[in-house]
């Protein structure tokens, strides 16, 4: 999809851009694959804020996405490419030959009328899903499982892709979008191709209201809060932090502190860290 640039007819329109939605073929979703979605506004079951800067926004239906792709040897035809308000990638409605309908993440280059299939014997074509052990070295993939049968968990955002680097016993070496090289079981499935809608990250919202439509609330600096709201708060005028190092709103060190569990069992599966040269 291309980027649409607006003329500066108002202050809010100045520098505003949006996607032109040229790839979208319908604006009416498949009703049988919709479920209601209640806005949580970043609250947990006690009503306390657990994720800040969330709330409001347009009402949405959740689209049930098939991340497992486990209907082996059953062909499906792509019927539509659709917008999904719950994710950055577009989705594709596919009709299987046995009558089942499903949504999948739409990879770049997938077109209406194209046939896709899942299973170990599937061809290396965009949209086909197969075990990592059956995918040739150098192939770009997305929607990667971490545990066989659990469904794709990695590389699902717009424009994202990972590359198969080789096989090592029962594991497959995969280079992720971040640059991290990781061993994943060869029986885990992945879908061939790059996630579509790669222009998504280039959109300039242009005004605060568009963030509010998306359910994103303002992010306030700690230095302009009161001392009871943030460790950086208080003081006369533009006061410095007043601590040895910047802190989170809960008093923990911010900026540069490693938050990954030092005893994570998956450490042994990481061949190269994302920040290693």
Swiss-Prot record:
Residues 219-277 are annotated as: Disordered. One of its GO terms (biological process) is cytoplasmic translation. Pfam families: Ribosomal_L2, Ribosomal_L2_C. GO terms for molecular function: rRNA binding; structural constituent of ribosome; transferase activity. The keyword Ribosomal protein applies. One of its GO terms (cellular component) is large ribosomal subunit. Residues 264-277 have a biased composition (Basic and acidic residues). The keyword rRNA-binding applies. Part of the 50S ribosomal subunit. Forms a bridge to the 30S subunit in the 70S ribosome. One of the primary rRNA binding proteins. Required for association of the 30S and 50S subunits to form the 70S ribosome, for tRNA binding and peptide bond formation. It has been suggested to have peptidyltransferase activity; this is somewhat controversial. Makes several contacts with the 16S rRNA in the 70S ribosome. HAMAP family: Ribosomal_uL2_B. This is Large ribosomal subunit protein uL2. It comes from Streptococcus gordonii (strain Challis / ATCC 35105 / BCRC 15272 / CH1 / DL1 / V288).
